[in-house]
């Protein structure tokens, strides 16, 4: 590695009339000129040195004490020559050479007469020469020039008094070029220095310019300090952010989830109600069962009852055969087309094994008018037989009171447990059978005198249907005892007339009449009778 320093002789041409002092004045700072081949050194200078005979340069490095020098024309030539031949190492420390930040005092004395002379100094170098001059505000600048000439002129003038203070910053750029084999390497380094300059000048002809430069090695700090930080958020602001996040995110999400759950619940309940309704409708269609219908409602699809309107306990219109050996008397059931409802004489209660030719009971039955068929059989003297299926059994219960007085029987309405006893007398089981001619005559007198109905019916003639209309009609008073007595007396007079020859010309008010004649059913007595006669 070899450094190349190209220096040339410096020719100094001085033209002056005599040797006189050089008044070097500066308005803001001292002048410092450095000439180097490989380095650039800034200096705080605001004006160029001017002199007619010599150039005065004074500098001190690294806060050296103030120095003052005055050079004449012969000495200036050798000094400038030494400056030109100096290398880059002169930038650190030298007694009479370059400084970037120093405090110096330049003093010079001039002659009394203000004469001015101009001189030209031609400084030539193969490398570069730098002249740095700063303005009056204290800001210094550095410039690098290669192969340049620095003219200098001096004039004698009256210096003014000035005091200036300011912040100055200088930049130093050092460039080193060396050869390493076939390649050329150039190193460039930059440093920044801040300084406070306070120049002062005096107001006299022998001007002495002085300034003090204090240098600090710290770099220039930026206007925004690195230690400065933004104000941190307080706990209140962080809590506020949490509240905002909760109100904007958590609450809407929760509300949406609640609405979704409520919708699912309502939908399931609706589906359940629809399923239950469909199952109930299917039950009604398949089984004919409607749970919403009252239990006493009679369905219109119900099968009609038999012609004799008898259903019985076991649902069969054919009751069991009569058997009175077990203490249960046999109740009659008239056949179809029969005019009376009484059983034949052979099956009368108490006439066990009696025949139709028996004297007493048959006569009593005939005198009492018990049954048109029985009276016809007794009058004609022939036998009267019923089909075996036309018998029914009296329901289980207490036997009738045989010791009841005639007055009580005459005054009490018949109570045989049948709803179809309108105009008909009580069952033959309510009063005991007459025994002998006296009993028959008394019974005949009772029937004829009291006007009671001699057309009795059995207690099991029929079991009425649960019909609200018939119940209402019965409760309305249509089946009162007075109307019964009037109707029974009329029917008795018709039945016991001596001109009656058969059942065909007798009025038939029996509920068992399946084919009544038109003449016999011209005027129905009540709504219940009309229903029994199938007139509705």
UniProtKB/Swiss-Prot annotation:
Any single Gene Ontology cellular-component annotation: plasma membrane
Sequence intervals crossing the membrane: 247-267, 351-371
Record has Transmembrane as a keyword: yes
Descriptive protein name: Uncharacterized serine-rich protein C11G7.01
Keyword Protease: no
One example of a Gene Ontology biological process annotation: positive regulation of cell integrity MAPK cascade
Region (Disordered): 1-76, 204-237, 287-354, 373-536
Compartments where found: Membrane
Keywords in alphabetical order: Membrane, Transmembrane, Transmembrane helix
Lineage: Eukaryota, Fungi, Dikarya, Ascomycota, Taphrinomycotina
Polar residues: bias regions: 290-326, 403-424, 480-509
Membrane topology note: Multi-pass membrane protein
Composition skew (Low complexity), residue ranges: 7-76, 204-234, 327-350, 430-454, 517-527
Source organism: Schizosaccharomyces pombe (strain 972 / ATCC 24843)
Chief localisation class: membrane
């Amino acid at each position: 590695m070899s450094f190349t320093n190209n220096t040339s002789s410096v020719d100094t041409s001085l033209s002056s009339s005599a040797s006189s002092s050089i008044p070097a004045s500066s308005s803001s700072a001292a002048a410092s000129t450095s000439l180097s081949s490989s380095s650039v050194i800034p200096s705080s200078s605001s004006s160029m040195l001017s002199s007619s005979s010599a150039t005065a340069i004074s500098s001190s490095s690294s806060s050296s004490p103030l120095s003052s020098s005055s050079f004449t024309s012969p000495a200036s030539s050798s000094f400038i020559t030494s400056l030109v031949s100096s290398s880059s190492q002169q930038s650190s420390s030298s007694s009479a050479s370059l400084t970037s930040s120093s405090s110096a005092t330049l003093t010079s004395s001039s002659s009394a007469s203000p004469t001015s002379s101009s001189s030209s100094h031609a400084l030539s170098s193969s490398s570069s020469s730098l002249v740095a001059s700063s303005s009056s505000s204290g800001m210094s600048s550095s410039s690098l020039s290669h192969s340049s000439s620095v003219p200098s002129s001096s004039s004698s003038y009256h210096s003014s008094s000035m005091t200036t203070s300011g912040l100055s910053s200088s930049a130093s750029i050092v460039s080193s070029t060396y050869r390493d084999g076939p390649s050329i390497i150039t190193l460039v380094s930059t440093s920044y220095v801040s300084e406070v300059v306070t120049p002062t000048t005096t107001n006299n002809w022998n001007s002495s310019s002085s300034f003090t430069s204090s240098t600090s090695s710290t770099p220039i700090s930026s206007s925004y300090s690195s230690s400065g930080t933004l104000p941190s958020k307080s706990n209140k602001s962080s809590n506020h952010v949490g509240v905002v996040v909760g109100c904007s995110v958590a609450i809407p999400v929760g509300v949406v989830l609640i609405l979704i759950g409520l919708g699912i619940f309502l939908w399931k309940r609706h589906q359940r109600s629809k399923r239950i309704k469909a199952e109930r409708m299917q039950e009604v269609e398949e089984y004919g069962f409607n749970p919403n219908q009252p239990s006493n409602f009679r369905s219109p699809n119900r099968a009609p009852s038999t012609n004799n309107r008898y259903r019985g306990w076991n649902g069969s219109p054919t009751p069991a055969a009569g058997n009175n050996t077990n203490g249960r008397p046999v109740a009659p059931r008239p056949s179809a087309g029969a005019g009376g409802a009484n059983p034949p004489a052979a099956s009368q209660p108490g006439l066990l094994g009696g025949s139709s030719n028996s004297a007493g009971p048959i006569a009593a039955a005939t005198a009492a008018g018990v049954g048109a068929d029985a009276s016809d059989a007794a009058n004609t003297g022939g036998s009267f037989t019923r089909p075996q299926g036309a018998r029914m059994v009296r329901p289980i219960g207490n036997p009738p009171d045989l010791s009841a007085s005639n007055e009580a029987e005459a005054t009490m309405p018949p109570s045989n447990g049948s709803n179809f006893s309108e105009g008909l007398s009580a069952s033959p089981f309510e009063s005991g059978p007459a025994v002998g001619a006296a009993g028959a005559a008394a019974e005949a007198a009772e029937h004829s005198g009291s006007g009671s109905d001699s057309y009795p019916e059995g207690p099991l003639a029929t079991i009425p249907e649960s019909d609200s209309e018939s119940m209402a009609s019965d409760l309305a008073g249509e089946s009162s005892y007075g109307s019964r007595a009037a109707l029974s007396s009329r029917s008795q007079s018709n039945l016991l007339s001596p001109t009656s020859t058969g059942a065909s010309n007798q009025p038939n008010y029996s509920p068992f009449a399946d084919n009544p004649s038109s003449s016999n059913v011209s005027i129905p007595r009540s709504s219940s009778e009309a229903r029994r006669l199938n007139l509705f």
